[in-house]
Amino acid sequence: MADTVTGPTILQQNDKRVVIKIVNQSDGSGGTTVFGDVSALDAREDGTAVAHLGLLRVWYSCQGGDGGDSYARLDEEDSDGDIPIIGLTGAGYWDFREFGGIPADKSSNSNQSDVNLVVPGAADDGNMYTIIAEFQKIY
C-alpha cells in the first residue's frame, strides 16, 4: 500500500515567496513526500533559479490514531541524512516572519534543498496530515 497524497499544490507564487499545500492520508507504514521542489518553482524575472526555501508560516493539522503517532516533520532533503526544519503535532499555526523565518540550511554537504513532508512509520492507517506552508524563495 501507499499513502494517499493530494498535492503538493502551489496556492500562490511570486518572486519572493511561495505558498504550498499538501494533504496526506497515511496507510500506516510512514513515508516521505517532496513538499517543496525548488527545481519546479518559478525562477526570478532575470532567470535566476530558486536555490533554497526558508519557512515563514505554517498551518497544520496532524490528526488521528491514538495521539502518540499523529505527528509529522518538514525536512530539508540531503543525501547525507535529511535536516529537520520543524516537527508538527496536533493542529495549529506558526508565524516566523517576525524574525525573518526559519532559514534554509546552506551547509556545504550534499544538500538538495527540497523540503520533504515526513510521516512516521508509527502512524496509524487513516491518520490525516494537512500542511499549508509559506516559504521565502532564496536565490
Each predicted region: which residue ranges?
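Beta-rich globular "head" domains
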Residues: G36-R73
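Noncatalytic modules at the cell exterior or secretory-pathway interfaces
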Residues: G100-N127
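Solvent-exposed, flexible loop/coil segments flanking beta-strands in beta-rich domains
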Residues: A2-G47
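An anionic, turn-rich surface loop/hairpin at beta-sheet edges
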Residues: G81-P103
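Short, surface-exposed beta-strand/strand-loop-strand elements in extracellular ectodomains
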Residues: G64-L88
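C-terminal interaction-tip segments
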Residues: D3-N14, P120-Y139
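Residue-level recognition of well-ordered beta-strand positions that form the cores
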Residues: W59-S61, V118, E134
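Short, surface-exposed beta-strand/loop "edge" segments at domain boundaries and coil↔beta transitions
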Residues: S26-V34, D66-D69, G121-I131
